[in-house]
Design a protein with these regions (language model features):
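Bacterial Sec-dependent N-terminal signal peptides
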Residues: 1-23, 230, 271, 411-413, ...
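Positively charged, low-complexity intrinsically disordered regions
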Residues: 3, 13, 85-87, 109, ...
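N-terminal compositionally biased, intrinsically disordered segments and leader/signal-like regions
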Residues: 14-17, 207-208, 431, 435
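Beta-propeller fold recognition
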Residues: 19-259, 263-412
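C-terminal outer-membrane/trafficking sorting elements
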Residues: 418-425, 429-499
Length: 499
């Protein structure tokens, strides 16, 4: 019966669903990459000029929709500014109202997520680390400006306090909603913070304490596996490397294990990481001299102690590197460059060297040891340059967790309403519900609605006209019902409680 309900819901919403992808990356000094299944389709110029945080989203065909980045050079040179981020449209111009986004100049401060059950609405989550910091969201609507978009809500604060650089998100087990996950900068803690994004908005914050408390400073990487079944935690400050199982239905962390213990003087400044497509191998970069690229076999009970050195660079000009799994199944490593070990950003116009004009490539990251086929500086960027940061993109292709308790689009956190076009009241009701269409421009149209029982049976269908309409369930049994209202570009689903 659960599958029947899911099937009916899918029939109602399939035409509004859009499969978004990570097929474009925008990063560094003006660099954009479009991927295909086998490699790289093209390399092109963008408006990004940032050493760190960036995020990109594309449609199912690989067409760029928009992107966001931490401060460009002009804003970076104004240290007093804290709202430095920018959002750019697909034509590489600043999006309407896309300036002054809360953000600084770190490396994993930004995320782009599709707004659940919407085709053209998105949320840009951004964070800041230093005193006065916060995590916030800005809502993007691509219905504006002929598809170029507009930021319709900006810098809506979700939480205050110093947010550790390393926010991430994993799709809920229902295949629609998103868990936003982050840690805070406290001297010693093991607290993880979670916010759920649903069609109705963003939930209140929930927290979980798990693992061994350790010093958490301005950097703490949360790196999900491709399936979202586990998360790697990297603490550059004290060298802690840990692994957690993750429940996509409940958002709970469990099965904590320590891969490398904290130390007041860690041997390696663990910096960034990514898991292979088969989720067996973890690749870690360091912020040290020499700088290392390690492969760690997560099936090995002594994984970190038996790590394999894939590459090392013994130079003050190379202080660290970012690493990401790309849509083509390869991994790419940004090789940061610092002139004379000091001037890492911005590059002088004359500084075009192999390290900052190439990405290194792990061609077969699913393979053990040197069979991963690593090629240092193996991908030329066609004259564009890279800094330390690579896109902090999430797995947009992750679907429902089949067979789980939540694959029927049910969630359990209280939700905060955010720009829902339809309001139903009273709800609960003894049977007479009033439906209010909130946007005046929509009052001239009629919209089809359908009501399903909890067993998935269609019990009523009709049309909503004007500002308000009535739905009568007086003669139906008490219980929960699902109201689906078909709007031009989305299906709104509201649970009705009949007393």
């Amino acid at each position: 019966m659960r599958k029947l309900i899911l099937f009916i819901l899918l029939l109602q919403t399939v035409f509004t669903k859009a499969q978004f992808t990570n097929l474009n990356w925008t990063f560094g000094d003006s660099c954009g990459i479009k991927f295909n299944a086998n490699g790289i389709d093209s390399i092109y110029r963008t408006s990004v000029n940032a050493r760190g945080s960036c995020a990109t989203i594309s449609d199912s065909l690989g067409n760029l929709l928009f992107y966001a980045a931490s401060p460009d050079l002009e804003l970076y040179q104004t240290p007093s500014l804290i709202d430095r981020g920018r959002i750019y449209n697909k034509q590489h111009d600043k999006m309407d109202n896309g300036d002054t986004i809360f953000c600084q100049n770190w490396y994993r401060e930004m995320l782009i997520l599709p707004w659940p059950d919407s085709v053209n609405k998105f949320v840009v989550v951004s964070s800041m680390t230093t005193p006065g910091a916060k995590i916030s969201y800005s809502k993007v609507d691509l219905d504006y400006n002929n598809g170029l978009g507009k930021v319709v809500n900006k810098n809506v604060v979700l939480d205050t306090g110093e947010i550790s650089d390393g926010i991430t998100a994993i799709k809920h087990g229902n295949g629609r909603d998103w868990w936003i996950i982050y840690k805070k900068w406290f001297y010693t803690n093991n607290t993880i913070y979670k916010i759920l994004l649903t069609p109705n908005g963003l939930s209140s914050i929930t927290t979980q304490s798990i693992g061994v408390p350790s010093f958490v400073g301005s950097f703490y990487r949360l790196i999900p596996s491709k399936s979202g079944e586990f998360i790697i935690g990297i603490n550059p400050g004290d060298g802690t490397l840990e692994k957690f199982s993750f429940d996509r239905c409940t958002g709970n962390f469990s099965n904590h294990s320590i891969l490398n213990n904290a130390s007041p003087n860690p041997a390696y400044g663990l910096w960034d990481g990514a898991t292979s497509l088969n989720e067996r191998f973890l690749y870690i970069t360091t912020l040290s001299t020499p700088e290392y690229l390690f492969q760690i076999d997560l099936l090995n009970p002594n994984a970190f102690q038996n790590k394999i050195v894939i590459d090392s660079i013994d130079s003050l000009n190379n202080p660290g590197s970012g690493i990401r799994l790309a849509p083509n199944g390869k991994m790419y490593r940004s090789n940061s460059w610092c002139q004379n070990g000091l001037y890492c950003y911005p590059f002088l116009d004359s500084v075009f060297v192999p390290v900052n004009t190439h990405l290194s490539v792990i061609n077969e990251p699913d393979n053990f040891s040197l069979a991963c086929n690593y090629i240092g500086l193996g991908q030329y960027l066609n004259g564009f340059r890279t800094y330390l940061g690579l896109p902090n993109d999430v797995n947009l292709a992750l679907g429902p967790l089949s067979g789980s308790m939540c694959d029927t689009l049910s969630v359990g956190l209280s939700e905060v309403k955010d720009d829902i076009p339809i309001q139903v009241f009273p709800n609960p009701s003894t049977g007479n519900f009033t439906v209010n269409i909130k946007h005046e421009a929509m009052h001239m149209y009629g919209f089809t609605y359908s009501i399903y029982s909890i067993q998935g049976l269609l019990i009523q269908r009709g049309e909503l006209k004007g500002k308000t309409s009535s739905i009568n369930l007086t003669f139906f049994e008490s219980g929960m019902y699902l109201l689906n209202v078909t709007l031009p570009k989305q299906v709104v689903q509201i649970k009705l409680s009949k007393l």
